[in-house]
């Protein structure tokens, strides 16, 4: 967590704080008419030219053909088939494309794309007889496939067979990203999240063209990655988490599994080992890393700024070199993140010494450095990337680094932090950087946000999710969605397309997709959520839930087309927004 002072984050307190609170979340409400598919794509494409009256029917005989002889293109085709088969029930065989695109096919080709799409963009042309996605790389094909998914009804994301028909509107789309780097961060140190949860998050990122996953692997509360040369980091340092749970860690095989799974979704994993602060789990594991030679106790609170590696000891840099070497060997991507934030227990002089010693250790692994923008207090090489997490719109260190050739990742805490609450009644999350509603998450320009950091100096945008209060996949969903989609659009779409009114319409059209995927998203009152023809709220026989009403154990209400039973006394806690920690039991659709 990036915060100037310590904060408590017990789950029980988060739940109790709901008592007497009101909610600003909205119900799923039917749009006046279903949003046309070409007006519901997130991120919005750079250019869309509709073909009036034309649709491509996806039917049982439809096939997927891919660039002949290209394994990466075939992998994208296999991925697309895997998305569409469960809901449609169609076979959708994948094979090499012949010389000309056959009728009744979806073609994924690595030839014929306009030069303007670059290495990550694509061209998509849908006609009455075929859909053709062209790109220069498999990354571009994969991006085009994500757009293709959103041209189909949201129920296509269901894991079970759904009724058709399935049609794709006729159009020509030419699309490419504003920034090459579009990322999200998951903190697996404060609360450990198993491989299955990380993979689920990867799938959620991929559909919005996010191409980098930053994993926060070590902090005061736990060390989460196996390091053979320092085994107690995980066997001891990985045994705790916030609140005193059992913690956990990834073996090298599990981490490799995550990296490979992300790569199959065209996402690069960026591992972070935060230092010289946020290191209590390491200090507790090895006494020799402490200046006084005494290992502190493991900690499960959420205080920050109290721990530091011993800057003057040679063994500190042996330790760091070993960790970086083993981590780099597991990580095919170009970056390693060294943290560098909130090092309050490290003197200013020692901090500069530390950064200057660690930079060449990273370079020795063949990787480039990313660090929280605090590292820009040192003189950085042009290859280093400071990640801005502050709440201001200027930073002298960052602007100096840019003047020397560095590019910046933007994650301003009051705009991009997914762990910030939406409002005062949000049941989980923090608020030190302020509340971030959907419009706040969308309403800033990364290319003109930081003084001295113009568009060309921005590597991209990243959405960090710190996990002091985040325990379950449902918690991840609730804080990430819908804000992650807003950040994805900021990173992908040209600024000329930026329009809140249009975006909130397209965002509302995502609801049927998220419902089909089982994503527990926050139903912001700022957005008119389209139910896509599913059961509407208010059709249940039981009384509709009210934020102002007091409920006690056994009370039954209806909300969002489901029937809910209260477990205990409550007022203001919206059914379906707090997962396993909530007061309401979901009895299913009415």
Where are the model-predicted features located?
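Secretory targeting and sorting signals
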Residues: 1-34
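Flexible, acidic glycine-rich loops studded with aromatic residues
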Residues: 89, 381, 390-537
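Feature activates predominantly on carbohydrate-active enzymes
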Residues: 117-306, 315-317, 325-328, 332-335
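Tryptophan-rich substrate-binding surfaces of secreted polymer-degrading and adhesive proteins
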Residues: 530-590
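Conserved, mostly hydrophobic/aromatic
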Residues: 64, 137, 184, 205, ...
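Hydrophobic faces of well-ordered beta-strands that scaffold small-molecule active sites
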Residues: 182-186, 213-215, 269-273, 336-338, ...
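Active-site neighborhood of glycoside hydrolase catalytic domains
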Residues: 282, 286-406
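Contiguous, structured surface segment used for ligand recognition
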Residues: 34-179, 475, 491-502, 508-517, ...
